[in-house]
A protein has these predicted regions:
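Long, intrinsically disordered, low-complexity segments
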Residues: 18, 184, 273-275, 381-452
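Acidic, glycine-rich segments characteristic of secretory precursors and extracytoplasmic regions
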Residues: 18-68, 442-452
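Short, surface-exposed recognition loops and adjoining beta-strand edges that mediate ligand/DNA contacts
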Residues: 33-34, 61-81, 197-276, 380-384
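Conserved, well-structured interaction surfaces
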Residues: 44, 52, 83-155, 193-197, ...
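Inward-facing hydrophobic residues that define packing positions of alpha-helical scaffold repeats
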Residues: 47, 113-116, 182, 189, ...
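Hydrophobic-face positions in mid-chain alpha helices that act as interaction patches
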Residues: 231-338, 342, 397, 432
Length: 452
């Protein structure tokens, strides 16, 4: 049954998508597909479709994914949606378990987790793939799966963790405690760092390598407060000759930069990134999102990021601010959606060192983004002041990128500070409600998160 269902799902993956993941339902057609994982081209095609789904339909999409929903849930983005999909409820911190948007995020992300599991199982069972191909494909699938799990855990708290293709098991699985899940992700991503090579399999860095896996591992270490391991892992990336800190503020979001660890290519040649499609407005009020005044005011006027990455739009005397990191609306030849960039590694290193009372060693890593932005570098800072400046600087650097702000506030225990700006904020809203549809299908997911 497991092998039959694997063939069904991989066949569907090569064409389109299955239905649910945690509760996928039995396939209506259980005819086996060709042996996908006996050939590296078809195995890569199966994996490529996981990438496409992650790009277009997951919590990680640069469109209506974690970047926008996390940014509006926190204090980066004002929401102007006029729809029935629940975006305004996220922005107003009034989520209910019936919210369509969170149900979609959950369902689509778990679909891709299941497909990643199918790819992992398929290459493990293959008798014909070379060892190098097997390691690479499994390593990439492990990284994709772990990244999806990481964001789902940060949003929902305790969630199901499964590496299984067994239908009956998955449809009744209970939740894994957040601490245990993060420990498991540490194990999974560590395995990915062993399986993957430093060399990229594509010159455009659209597939992750070992260093991309190490970045995620360092992020997990930081989340688990394993400061020394975070420092050691970040150092491996910083010392790699593959990467260089981009000196030109105008080049940071161009696809050819040597500071890029991993990026996602738009579906068609010339397509805009999903970030441009989501955030762009001009000569009118915002349609979807605009930057909050609170965020814009966090930048000094002489900060080059404010000048290069934020566009002010004024209509009839009223001004709004647009995220303008990605700029090409059409005929896009030089922008892909950057998932991981070296600047994050510098911030991980800075925080990990400072947490070990090595502020003097941490200063250069904090100053890197300041100096590129045209700001005066710090020569020395007391520990408490360093942590304050790191929070400010990271907010300026990573606004509207994959909810860095939300994740940071959560890790620092500072989410409740949102109550000064967001009148509906309450302490229990550190996590989102589990979707009602999932609870009804699988009562083992109870209890619902506190407050919902």
């Amino acid at each position: 049954m497991k092998k039959i269902y694997l063939f069904f799902c991989i066949g569907a993956l090569l064409l389109t998508a299955c239905e649910d993941l945690i509760d996928v339902g039995y396939p209506s057609n259980q005819l086996g597909t060709p042996q996908v994982f006996e050939d590296v081209q078809t195995a890569d095609a199966a994996l490529a479709n996981v990438y496409a789904l992650v790009r277009d339909r997951s919590v990680l999409t640069g469109g209506s994914g974690i970047g926008s929903c996390g940014g509006s849930y926190a204090d980066e983005l004002d929401c102007y949606y006029n729809d029935q999909n629940g975006h305004m409820d996220i922005y107003q911190n009034q989520l209910q378990e019936t919210n369509t948007y969170i149900s979609t995020i959950w369902r689509d992300s778990y679909q891709q987790i299941y497909y990643a599991n199918a790819v992992i199982y398929g290459v493990e069972q293959s008798a014909t793939l070379s060892g190098d191909d097997r390691n690479r494909i499994k390593g990439e699938a492990l990284l994709l799966r772990s990244l999806l799990y990481f964001y789902l855990q940060q949003l929902f708290g305790d969630i199901p963790y499964t590496a299984s293709l067994d239908y009956e098991y998955n449809r009744t699985i209970g939740k894994t405690k957040a601490a245990i899940l993060l420990e498991q992700l540490e194990t999974d991503v560590t395995e990915a760092t062993v399986l993957l090579e430093d060399d990229y399999r594509d010159a455009e860095r659209i597939y992750p390598n070992r260093k991309a896996a190490q970045l995620l591992l360092a992020r997990i270490y930081l989340t688990r407060e394993e400061w020394l391991l975070a420092e050691q892992t970040a150092k491996k990336i910083i010392q790699s000759p593959l990467y260089h800190y981009e000196a030109d503020i105008h080049e940071v979001f161009h696809k050819s930069g040597k500071h890029i660890l991993w990026q996602l290519k738009p579906q068609n040649s010339g397509d805009a990134t999903s970030e441009v499609t989501l955030y762009y407005f001009d000569n009118s009020a915002p349609h979807n999102y605009a930057l909050t005044q609170h965020l814009v005011d966090a930048f000094p006027d002489d900060d080059l990021r404010k000048q290069a990455w934020i566009a002010e739009i004024t209509v009839n005397g009223q001004s709004w601010y647009r995220p303008d990191k990605y700029k090409n609306r059409s005929n896009n030849t030089n922008e892909y959606s950057i998932m991981f960039r070296l600047e994050e590694v510098y911030f991980i290193m800075a925080e990990a060192l400072a947490r070990q009372n090595k502020v003097d060693e941490a200063l250069p890593y904090l100053n890197a983004s300041r100096e590129r932005a045209g700001l005066v570098p710090f020569t020395s800072l007391p520990a408490e002041e360093f942590h304050k400046e790191l929070r400010v600087e990271k907010r300026r650097e990573f606004f509207a990128e994959f909810a860095h702000r939300f994740l940071d506030l959560k890790r620092w225990g500072e989410l409740d500070e949102l109550s000064a700006l967001k009148p509906n904020w309450e302490e229990y809203k550190h996590v989102w409600p589990l979707p009602q549809s999932e609870l009804l299908m699988n009562p083992n997911l109870y209890p619902q998160n506190t407050g919902y």
